Amino acid sequence: MAAPAASGLSRQVRSFSTSVVRPFAKLVRPPVQVYGIEGRYATALYSAASKEKKLDQVEKELLRVGQLLKDPKVSLAVLNPYIKRTVKVKSLNDITKREKFSPLTANLMNLLAENGRLGNTQGIISAFSTIMSVHRGEVPCTVTTASPLDDAVLSELKTVLKSFLSPNQILKLEIKTDPSIMGGMIVRIGEKYVDMSAKSKIQKLSKAMREML
């Protein structure tokens, strides 16, 4: 059963890609590869929006779609599995007209409704946001500390982290607090991961001592 299902998903994505990119002969590759059915839709949308120079507009519209789907009334109207697809398509048409979405965003939502894939919408939005973040040269960085950092330490940390970036890259920093690491910090920047927490050091010490016995 898995193979036919996968084949069906591929046809849906090709259908979307063809419908939104039809005026153009060649797809624009995204700056980062995103996976799964959500990634395929997001990639096709990025290509079409890039060709039409509407990347920023589509990104804003998708964020608005995400907000709308969190509204209980909208969610009930378009995500309820017991509501007919034709009814969902009409509801979405009304929404896209009211919000004055671009044809790119409207076509995506209509196709998802017709193919019963509205449940993938948030994943597609997330995948598109990931592509756009890399497109802008943003480098995600998460720093976890046992207690909040004061302004002076935070400023110094930002300076150090930015020194690892190239001139055209932008640091996208998120600070988290987790008392369980006991002290120090854990840094994840891009695909790099450095654990300098006290908890990690204690665990390494404990392991080394056990190996000595």
UniProtKB/Swiss-Prot annotation:
Pfam families for the chain: OSCP
PTM sites of type N6-acetyllysine: 54, 60, 70, 73, 100, 158, 162, 172, 176, 192
GO function term, MF aspect, one: estradiol binding
Chain segment of the transit peptide: 1-23
Localization per Swiss-Prot or TrEMBL: Mitochondrion; Mitochondrion inner membrane
Function: Subunit OSCP, of the mitochondrial membrane ATP synthase complex (F(1)F(0) ATP synthase or Complex V) that produces ATP from ADP in the presence of a proton gradient across the membrane which is generated by electron transport complexes of the respiratory chain. ATP synthase complex consist of a soluble F(1) head domain - the catalytic core - and a membrane F(1) domain - the membrane proton channel. These two domains are linked by a central stalk rotating inside the F(1) region and a stationary peripheral stalk.
UniProt protein name: ATP synthase peripheral stalk subunit OSCP, mitochondrial
